[in-house]
Every structure is written in C-alpha cells, then in structure tokens.
C-alpha cells in the first residue's frame, strides 16, 4: 500500500496551510496511511510530527506532498535527498 505523507515548513493550530493539510490527510487516510510532518510545528499541535521523524525511505511505495510556503534550507535539503516522488503545492 502506498503511503502519502505531507511536509510543511511550519504547522499551527489554525493557519490555512495546516488546515488544508489536515483536510487532505483526512481524505488520503481513506485509501492508506497518511501523516503530516513539519520542520517547525507550533506548541500544542499534536497531530503533526517533526520532519526528522519522517526519515528517508528505501521503499518505493511512498509519496511526499510538499506545501511550499517559505524558504527553509533544512526542509529543502531533506526533500533534495529524498528518493520518493514529491508533489508540490505552492502557497503564495
């Protein structure tokens, strides 16, 4: 089963990008495993994991959705080293 996870730079309780990611995750969980990871989750955001917990996969059955909203070298370096397919959602 393919896992589809989302990556955010930051995650808040009520911000628009995190809310969108939660909505997408809810739909994705109907077809398989799906979580949200962020470099900077705000305190109290318990449903988003630290990006470092996602790790790099040697499996080919994982897709990453990246919500690009601002520059963060650590996130870009993680994605650059990632062998998984990455889907970009650009937030302006």
Where are each of the predicted segments found?
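N-terminal pre-catalytic "stem/leader" segment of glycosyltransferase-like enzymes
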Residues: 1-58
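Extended catalytic core of nucleotide-activated donor transferases of GT-like folds
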Residues: 44-92
């Amino acid at each position: 089963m393919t896992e589809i996870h989302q990556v955010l730079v930051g995650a808040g309780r009520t911000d628009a990008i995190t809310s969108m990611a939660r909505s997408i995750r809810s739909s994705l969980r109907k077809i398989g495993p799906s979580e949200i990871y962020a470099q900077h989750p705000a305190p109290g955001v318990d449903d988003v994991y630290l990006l470092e917990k996602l790790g790099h996969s040697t499996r080919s059955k994982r897709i990453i959705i990246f919500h690009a909203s601002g520059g963060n070298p650590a996130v870009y370096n993680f994605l650059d080293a990632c062998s998984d397919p990455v889907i970009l959602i650009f937030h302006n």
